[in-house]
């Protein structure tokens, strides 16, 4: 995916 940076 490409949304794992806003879940951090």
UniProtKB/Swiss-Prot annotation:
Source superkingdom: Eukaryota
pH dependence remark: Hemagglutinating activity is stable from pH 4 to pH 9 but drops sharply below pH 4 and above pH 9.
Keyword set, alphabetical order: Antimicrobial, Fruiting body, Fungicide, Glycoprotein, Hemagglutinin, Lectin
Reported temperature dependence: Hemagglutinating activity is stable below 60 degrees Celsius but drops sharply to about 20% at 80 degrees Celsius.
Post-translational modification: Glycosylated.
Biological processes, Gene Ontology terms: defense response to fungus; killing of cells of another organism; positive regulation of erythrocyte aggregation
Signal peptide: none
Molecular function GO terms recorded: carbohydrate binding
Chain's role: Has metal-independent hemagglutinating activity against erythrocytes from human, sheep, goat, rat, rabbit and chicken. Hemagglutinating activity is inhibited by glycoproteins fetuin, asialo-fetuin, fibrinogen, asialo-fibrinogen, thyroglobulin, bovine (BSM) as well as porcine submaxillary mucin and asialo-BSM but not by sugars alpha-L-fucose, D-glucose, D-galactose, D-glucosamine, D-galactosamine, lactose, D-melibiose, D/L-mannose, D-mannosamine, D-raffinose, L-rhamnose, xylose, glacaturonic acid or N-acetylglucosamine.
Assembly, per entry: Monomer.
Full protein name: Lectin
Organism of this sequence: Ganoderma lucidum (Ling zhi medicinal fungus)
């Amino acid at each position: 995916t490409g949304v794992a940076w806003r879940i951090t």
